[in-house]
Amino acid sequence: MNALQCKIISDGGENKIMSKDEYLITDAPLKALTVFAMPMILGSFFQQVYNMADSIIVGQFVGSSALAAVGACAALTNVFICVALGAGVGAGVLVSRYFGARDYSKMKTIVSTSLITFLILSILLGLFGFCFSHPMMSLLQTPADILDEAVLYLRVYFVGFPFLFMYNILSTMFTSIGESKIPLGLLIFSSVLNIFMDLWMVAGLGLGVFGAALATLIAQGISAVFSILIFFSRMRRYKSHFSWFDGQELRSMLRIAVPSVLQQSTVSIGMMIVQAVVNPFGTQALAGYSATMRVENVFSLIFISIGNAVSPYVSQNLGAKKNERIKKGYHAALVLDLCFAVLAFIVIETLHTQISSLFLGKDGTALAYQVSGDYMRWLGYFFIFMGIKMATDGVLRGLGIMWPFLIANMVNLAIRLSVALICAPRFGIAFVWLGVPAGWLANFLISYAALRKLWPIDKVDSI
């Protein structure tokens, strides 16, 4: 954001800050969401560049087996990332709501409480992941020829997991107060750093999979440290007394965070199960699948970013008691989703082979390219389903209505898993992805039914 311009207003002895960051509750909904979401979308792109750098550089300079080893870790690492994202939702919804209500004392209390809680949680999860990397990868039926490299990559990843966890929490905090440009700047910096270090360690020093993991760890660590310093600097501008830790605020946060963590992590566990379905098809099929999983993540994160932008928009307007703006914001998000769904279709239809070659290189076989291309083109037709699902889920999260959101996502997962587990072993690997659009559509219908019951938004408390 631009430098914060504010004035202090006395209201019953409490300092209130009128800030340019309040555009989410003042500007036209489509303009506000576009301005807010675009840095998040760009940030998602750079997040995937950050993630894909390992895969592309390893695939080009080491080979498809090393690419498969890195790709085999993706489903498992996503589980742990999604725990961080889900945890951030609980804190972010409350931070947005208190920010919209200009209750900066409670806002800073929930920030402090959540950071202390999640720092401890991230260290424990990192230790768990490091100690059990080999059993977890074996459980996923990782091919024997890439198992050792996959475990090595995973262990280095978990050493740096607290940095990744805290960075994701702080990114949510930034967006909750309308600061979406700062996470973008940090992501661009860390992405560029990660690419250069990947090239140096993998291509230059010949460290292979270990070098790729180490480069990511260092970039994550630096990004997390800068995030902490900048965020604390921003918080000092909101003058108010607060508690470092508050049990009641922790319980309020967990009521929102737990369903979100369950949703995020359960879906990722489901993707691990899908990974286990893919693994028996062999290393080349896994390489093709892993390549398109990365591409799916790029486009998915566009729609996820729009949904994530909707949540603080809704929560801030709810806190400011401007409920009439919520439905308009939802419709604006659907317009953005349609535009990006059309763009995704055009890009995939025209460039799917070239995109696959970025990952598979000259070492990729015909099978790897076929799996990657078929999977990619199928999803290109149906990304609009994901878009409208994410926008609807974003409204529910912003309102703090978590259980219908959780149920809808579980149905989505159940459809995807059922088709993959039952049909893929019998009829071929294509059934791993054929059920995905049906899951997205079912998710949207359930979430929308829950949302319709709340129109107009007058059945949810402001705080």
Description of each model-found segment:
Residues 25-61, 75-90, 94, 119-126, ...:
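N-terminal transmembrane alpha-helices
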Residues 45, 49-67, 137-144, 200-207, ...:
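Helix-terminus/linker motif at the lipid-water interface of multi-pass membrane proteins
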Residues 35-54, 156, 190, 219-223, ...:
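Transmembrane helical elements of multi-pass membrane transporters/channels
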Residues 1-37, 95-160, 204-258, 314-381, ...:
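Short alpha-helical transmembrane segments in multi-pass integral membrane proteins
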Residues 88, 157-175, 183-191, 212-225, ...:
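Short runs within selected transmembrane alpha-helices of multi-pass transporters and secretion channels
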Residues 40, 44, 56, 93, ...:
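Transmembrane alpha-helix boundary and packing residues in multipass membrane permease domains
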Residues 67-127, 164-183, 288-352, 386-400, ...:
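Small-residue-rich hydrophobic transmembrane alpha-helices
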Residues 79-82, 194-198, 223-228, 298-301, ...:
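Hydrophobic transmembrane alpha-helices of multi-pass small-molecule transporters
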